[in-house]
Amino acid sequence: MAFQFNFSIEEDLENKLTSLDDGTCVLKSQKGKEDKNQSTELPGLPQDRLWKCSSLGSAASSEDTDSPPSTADRSGVPEACEKQPSLKPAKEHVIPKDCDQVLENKVLEMLPGSQHVSTAVVKTISLKEKFPGENIVSQSFSSHSDLIPGVYEGGLKIWECTFDLMTYFTKAKVKFAGQKVLDLGCGSGLLGITASKGGAREVHFQDYNGLVIDEVTLPNVVANVPLQGDSNGINEPAGKRQRKSEVAQETCKCRLFSGEWAEFCKLVLSEKLFVKYDLILTSETIYNPDYYSTLHETLLRLLSRNGRVLLASKAHYFGVGGGVHLFQKFVEEKGVFETRTLEVIDEGLKRFLMEMTFKCPS
């Protein structure tokens, strides 16, 4: 699968990447099958769409069902805020002035892509060494799961719906320039990073887990900051690259938050000069029907009247019961948003790309 964008990563990033002698980042096909009941790993990823880097984990095969994906590409929140016994408080994660320190002790690798785009991401398997013992990192990798309900809602792995949406950005020539964008349940932050590279005036990243923001999203954002001097995707010579202060200035248009959706809403809406989002991007966040009410309320409160939501999802998620059709029915019953299917990917597990807009925008 090729992604074609009209921008490229900074040339100096090559100096920050750790050499991977084993050719870790390659596209591998999946072989064999595993019993669904023996693993909570996402099964049945289509062979031509799973970018299987060691940082992204592996998956077992299946035909029609799926288990919960990464929710910090998917942040889960229960149905009614007031009924939730312990809401995860929201907070903003400040980007350090010295962005180089964000990448210290991080192992970065390039995601496979076309010659027109390169994206570096943290090799998340390396985080096991930084966080030894019992914690959400070790538990996620040891259990082969990207979901520990109420504790860890994903983000250490990137699932194929994110790539589906990135591909759609190119095919549909989605315009980001001048837009205020929210990457909701961001995980790796690839959707928001793409928007930033596309000229968005401001990009916010939200994830359930603060650790995912600090150790995955933030480093990915810093590693992919576009140079203002770039022209037609060609990087300037080393001597003309932006100084650290200029890189920090470029990241100022990005803000990062952690916490549950309801708490995140409270935090940003408490700002006197808060302006709602023109575009909300979200991938694999509708796997659990228990979260639909809070997700719907979040979109209702944060989307501008003429804005739109671009959502990517599996048709159905095995084990939790959520999926596209159930979510569409929920939205229709609320009567606030119109939904439109943009694309159906019928390779392996069926996947959908959807658009949501207000029924009465003005």
Curated annotation (Swiss-Prot):
- The ranges of region (Disordered) come to 28-89
Q: Which example biological process does GO assign this protein? A: regulation of translational elongation
- According to its UniProt record, which reaction does this protein catalyse? L-histidyl-[protein] + S-adenosyl-L-methionine = N(tele)-methyl-L-histidyl-[protein] + S-adenosyl-L-homocysteine + H(+)
The record, for CDD domains, names: AdoMet_MTases
Q: Where is the composition biased (Polar residues)?
A: 55-73
The known PTMs are summarized as: Monomethylated at His-144 through automethylation. Automethylation at His-144 positively regulates the methyltransferase activity toward RPL3. Probably methylated on other residues.
Q: Where in the cell is it found?
A: Cytoplasm, Cytosol; Nucleus; Nucleus, Nucleolus
Residue positions of the PTM Phosphoserine? Answer: S62, S67
Q: What is its EC number?
A: 2.1.1.85
Which keywords has UniProt assigned to this entry? Cytoplasm, Methylation, Methyltransferase, Nucleus, Phosphoprotein, S-adenosyl-L-methionine, Transferase
Where in this protein does the record say Tele-methylhistidine is found?
A: H144
InterPro entries membership: Methyltransf_16 (IPR019410), SAM-dependent_MTases_sf (IPR029063)
Q: Could you state a single Gene Ontology molecular function term?
A: protein-L-histidine N-tele-methyltransferase activity
Oligomeric and partner information? Interacts with GRWD1 and members of the heat shock protein 90 and 70 families; these proteins may possibly be methylation substrates for the enzyme.
Q: What does this protein do?
A: Protein-L-histidine N-tele-methyltransferase that specifically monomethylates RPL3, thereby regulating translation elongation. Histidine methylation of RPL3 regulates translation elongation by slowing ribosome traversal on tyrosine codons: slower elongation provides enough time for proper folding of synthesized proteins and prevents cellular aggregation of tyrosine-rich proteins.
Q: Which family does it belong to?
A: Belongs to the methyltransferase superfamily. METTL18 family.
Q: What is this protein called?
A: Histidine protein methyltransferase 1 homolog
Organism, per UniProt? Rattus norvegicus (Rat)
